[in-house]
């Protein structure tokens, strides 16, 4: 039955199975998962005269992917089955996908695998140097990037996204040394945070140097900087020979994109090059921390937990959007309303009253004993915050496309990544009209 299901999924994408191999398995190391033996790959290569260097291995355990790569194949990782549980064991440069269909679709578009990705990155870098816009993957969400020093290109980002000019952009670098020309000072605390969390989902707001155009910083005396963990993003920045100013690659205020298809659906070609790097590993935006004043100020929760930051800073203040005065923002993600689907959304503690509403979509944090007649999607069956964060925007988009009258989301535990999940859902719910929020 499993093989039949896989056959059907792959056939829909245009990939047809010629033969199934029985794969020898063995239990190893700390994990109770059953691991394949590479012998079946070598046997398949002999039977069909395959060059494994031009072949693909798709699996939901790091062992699957690394086994394939060990014999020369290109590995694709699925966030199904054991996938979420073992994601931390997977090297950062491996591509990940939410479904087998997504992985199959990527293979058909990139038959030469790494060579095709390299070509896309080179085309992207050439576009950046010409003053163009490139949509590219990071570990958080897909970004829409331009040369930070090209004001015309940066202005086009605001135009394509319909983004207000008072909302600044994050500058992305591929090496720490690229930060120094952008700022007037790097404090000891900033240096420690960079060493601990970079490359990774932490943005630091620092005093800006005059070389950074005001359009990037919305006229603020500070600049937001981060180094993405995604290998392809850093390679794009390096080949572009400039830091990139890059917000999320979506229409302003709407749900952020975590796959290339999400970018296509929202921006409709408002870019010169789109680099398809699979699904985003973290799935929500970076944490933003301002070090421009006295006490470190958390402007936006994100991929790095507040608890982890405090281990270095010792103390921290929290920004609350409702206390904001004036129109200027020090970084992205500070507005009251953001990340919203087109369908009204409400954040609740108890989703049970909506269980029998066919016109209401339900976002569950984890598996529930309630039997839902309404469309329901689970962020993490086992209640894992990391898995829930990675699925959040995908699930929001899925329910948003169903023509529902309302989406209700179950609040996550407010610790670790849960704070970032609830922040996104709270902001996505702000624009929901009162009559939608109060229906039950």
Task: Give names to the regions the model predicted.
Residues 4-19, 26-57, 61-113:
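Asp-based, Mg2+/Mn2+-dependent phosphohydrolase catalytic module
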Residues 23-24, 58, 79, 99, ...:
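Conserved residues at the C-terminal ends of beta-strands
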Residues 1, 91-94, 260-262, 424:
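Short low-complexity, flexible loop/linker segments enriched in glycine and/or proline
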Residues 20-22, 77, 347, 378:
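A structural preference for short, hydrophobic beta-strand core positions in alpha/beta folds
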Residues 9, 21, 326-328:
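Hydrophobic alpha-helical segments with strong N-terminal bias
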